[in-house]
């Protein structure tokens, strides 16, 4: 069959000695080589490096046939695309653009640091926007008042509104209330008792002089004006905010309700009712019946923490065991991958055949016994399966599926064999380069770093703004038109009024920051992919697998990518990042429109989101194959993407079969490892399996460590199988290139394994070593 040879080596180019492979020896009179680089017109002729038996003269070029011995392994190296391929910096403009963008990201971070203060998000603010627990020189000193107290929590709809600001007076306090109190208790109190309560349990705004409050009428007036609190409940600090303890502690909650003086209901019954005093049910949001049902219970969080503290080392051991099983599965796929695939196909055929046979038999039985069809509504769904037509439809459907599946298998059986052989070769590649299994830790750590950078900048930007202080007017009030003053200066009457924000500017800076996160994350992923692809490609194109594969193949491939291909990596990751940010903006627009959008707009947005999701999936597939071509030939991104896309479209059936077969194996591997570790952890943590010598653990919720083991096992398996998937994809692209560019002659030998040659019915004119 004719083969395209559009990748033949040009006549005059510069070739680099790469990965430690020996170059042919230069002739005595040739110019000196410099740093392992030769101009191609000084590369020594084949007859000076290789020797040929006279009997082979009819099968090799004339200039080789005059010599005695042929060394085909060395000859094959001349056609290794990783050795004799022109290498140079690719997509330099994109690389420059990427670094300019990173400089812009630094500028955005600088704006965030200049304008922002994360303490504004960490520390709560009172009704006058002053931060609790903070000392702002010249304005206020709340360093000894770290907690935020809400005058009336019933005006807060939810925790979210409480954290963001309730429509009630908020006050920074030294400590949260430790007792239940109603101002109605002081209706008949003496002056000394009122003054004592004002100091200890009554909270008022800072403009109230509590020492002047000596009568109940004065206190009632302040309460009605919102200057003093009408009640307090026993509270605990949560995120530096005071919340009723009853919400978090069921035991105390029940005790408060059941005829205890530690409740607002009791105080109302004893000292009188008032519209300003809520019921306990309004504060806690829980009924007394629910409280009673959990009277003997402890907080769930405490139990979960207890379970984790008791099982952390067993959990880590099981997750580590999942990693070992993942490695063992790669060995199993190497030895039994073909068997697993053909066995799966056989099981599907048998299942369809059994289903078809049973359905025809059931239809014949019902038809013979005189069963009738009645497809009116039946509450019992089983009634429809007592009708012959139902089984006739099922029989026809399963028979058609069986026939189609059988024809497809017969048509693509050779391609399935190729897929199995490629998977076996990928397993061999991983087995010979064990460092590939550890390499994903490197991009994983980089991803953590990128996420930390993005999160930090996002927090600084979210807290951006300028603190504004204004001078009080003659009437003691502060207005938006009042004169501004320096918050750090000790000026009489200078009052803190809030924070001014450039909302639109901050929004677009956040968009820039998010786009930087997407681009850099995709860049890190691409860098890891191209490094692994380079390592696996070096294995495929090595004739002698034991000697020609370079030492530290992943590090060499990573170095090659950083040295030459950063621009191409930036180009590919930029495409994915653009699609991602468009999808985020579409979600933002959808959220902003909310319920106001009509059905047409909603449908249009849904279509756009679906299209861009499909586009992202397609571009991820395209860029991944482009990175493999870059790792092999070192071309720019566009050329590599075009070559890989055309290569795949010319072999679309092979591509689909290989990806589906590999997907089945990887899915089976992930599922079996995750399911197996889940079952094992279930039997152990539930106490059904007792290990001799290992103390039995008593847990409140044994499903907690089981869930952690299952999730950890899945991610551990995914870590291994991502490498395996990259190995299969790279080996497949190399195989397609090998099939199209080589013909088995001495000048262009195949690099594929003997098994693949046998499946394709090809052979090399002179057998070359392939170990």
From Swiss-Prot:
Any single Pfam family the record assigns to this protein: Choline_transpo
Bilayer topology term: Multi-pass membrane protein
Sugar attachment sites: 141, 259, 480
Entry's localization field: Membrane
Record has Transmembrane helix as a keyword: yes
Molecular function, one GO term: transmembrane transporter activity
Transmembrane segments: 96-116, 312-332, 335-355, 392-412, 441-461, 514-534, 566-586, 603-623, 662-682, 701-721
Top-level lineage group: Eukaryota
GO annotation terms (biological process): transmembrane transport
Keyword annotations of the record: Glycoprotein, Membrane, Transmembrane, Transmembrane helix
Family per record: Belongs to the CTL (choline transporter-like) family.
Protein name from the UniProt record: Choline transporter-like protein 1
Species of the source: Caenorhabditis elegans
Originating gene: chtl-1
């Amino acid at each position: 069959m004719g083969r395209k040879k559009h990748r033949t080596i040009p006549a005059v180019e510069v070739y680099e000695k790469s990965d430690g492979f020996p170059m042919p020896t230069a002739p005595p009179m040739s110019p000196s080589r410099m740093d392992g680089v030769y101009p191609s017109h000084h590369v020594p002729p084949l007859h000076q490096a290789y020797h040929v038996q006279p009997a082979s003269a009819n099968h090799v070029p004339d200039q080789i046939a005059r010599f005695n011995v042929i060394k085909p392994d060395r000859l094959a190296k001349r056609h290794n695309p990783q050795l004799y391929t022109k290498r140079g910096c690719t997509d330099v403009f994109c690389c420059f653009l990427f670094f300019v963008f990173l400089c812009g990201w630094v500028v955005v971070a600088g704006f965030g640091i200049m304008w922002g203060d994360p303490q504004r998000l960490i520390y709560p603010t009172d009704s006058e926007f002053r931060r609790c627990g903070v000392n702002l020189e010249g304005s206020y000193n709340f360093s000894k008042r770290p907690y935020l107290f809400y005058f009336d929590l019933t005006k807060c709809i939810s925790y979210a509104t409480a954290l963001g600001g309730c429509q009630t007076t908020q006050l920074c306090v030294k400590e949260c209330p430790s007792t239940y109190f109603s101002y109605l208790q002081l209706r008949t109190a003496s002056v000394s008792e009122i003054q004592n309560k004002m100091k200890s349990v009554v909270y008022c705004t800072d403009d109230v002089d509590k020492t002047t409050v000596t009568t109940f009428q004065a206190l009632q007036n302040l309460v009605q004006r919102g200057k003093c609190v009408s009640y307090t409940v026993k509270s605990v600090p949560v995120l530096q905010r005071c919340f009723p303890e009853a919400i978090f502690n069921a035991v105390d909650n029940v005790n408060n309700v059941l005829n205890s003086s530690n409740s607002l209901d009791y105080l109302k019954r004893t000292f009188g009712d008032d519209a300003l005093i809520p019921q306990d049910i309004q504060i806690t949001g829980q009924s007394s019946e629910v409280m009673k049902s959990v009277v003997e219970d402890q907080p769930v969080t405490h139990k979960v923490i207890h379970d984790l503290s008791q099982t952390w080392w067993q959990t880590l051991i099981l997750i580590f065991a999942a990693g070992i099983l993942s490695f063992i599965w790669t060995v199993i796929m190497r030895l039994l991958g073909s068997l697993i695939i053909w066995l799966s196909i056989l099981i599907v055929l048998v299942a369809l055949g059994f289903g078809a046979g049973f359905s025809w038999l059931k239809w014949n039985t019902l038809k013979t016994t005189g069963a009738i069809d009645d497809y009116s509504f039946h509450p019992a769904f089983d009634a429809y399966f007592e009708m012959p037509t139902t089984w006739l439809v099922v029989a026809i459907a399963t028979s058609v599926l069986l026939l189609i599946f059988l024809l497809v298998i017969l048509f693509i059986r050779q391609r399935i064999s190729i897929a199995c052989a490629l998977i076996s070769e990928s397993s061999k590649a991983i087995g010979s380069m064990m460092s590939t299994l550890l390499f994903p830790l490197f991009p994983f750590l980089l991803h953590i770093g990128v996420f930390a950078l993005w999160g930090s900048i996002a927090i600084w930007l979210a807290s951006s703004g300028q603190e504004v202080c204004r001078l009080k007017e003659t009437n003691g009030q502060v207005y938006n038109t009042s004169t501004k003053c320096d918050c750090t200066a000790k000026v009489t009457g200078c009052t803190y009024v809030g924070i001014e924000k450039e909302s639109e500017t901050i929004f677009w800076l956040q968009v820039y920051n998010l786009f930087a996160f997407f681009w850099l994350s995709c860049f890190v992923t691409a860098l890891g992919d191209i490094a692994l692809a380079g390592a696996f490609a070096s294995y495929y194109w090595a004739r002698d697998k034991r000697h020609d594969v370079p030492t530290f193949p992943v590090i060499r491939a990573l170095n090659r990518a950083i040295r030459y291909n950063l621009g191409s990596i930036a180009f590919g990751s930029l495409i994915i990042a653009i699609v991602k940010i468009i999808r985020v903006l579409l979600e933002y627009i959808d959220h902003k429109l909310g319920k106001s959008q009509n059905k047409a707009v909603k449908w249009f947005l849904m279509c756009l989101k679906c299209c861009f999701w499909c586009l992202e999936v397609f571009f991820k597939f395209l860029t991944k194959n482009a990175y493999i071509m870059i790792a092999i030939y070192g071309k720019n991104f566009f050329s590599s993407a075009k070559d890989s896309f055309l290569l795949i479209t010319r072999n679309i059936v092979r591509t689909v079969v290989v990806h589906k077969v590999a997907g089945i194996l990887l899915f089976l591997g992930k599922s079996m490892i995750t399911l197996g570790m889940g079952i094992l952890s279930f039997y152990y943590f539930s106490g059904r399996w007792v290990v001799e010598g290992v103390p039995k653990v008593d847990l409140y919720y044994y499903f907690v460590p089981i869930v952690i083991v299952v999730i950890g096992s899945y991610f551990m398996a995914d870590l291994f199988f991502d490498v395996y998937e990259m190995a299969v994809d790279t080996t497949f692209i190399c195989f397609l290139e090998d099939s199209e560019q080589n013909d088995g002659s001495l000048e262009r030998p195949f690099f594929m394994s003997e098994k693949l040659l046998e499946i394709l019915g090809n052979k090399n004119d002179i057998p070359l070593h392939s170990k």
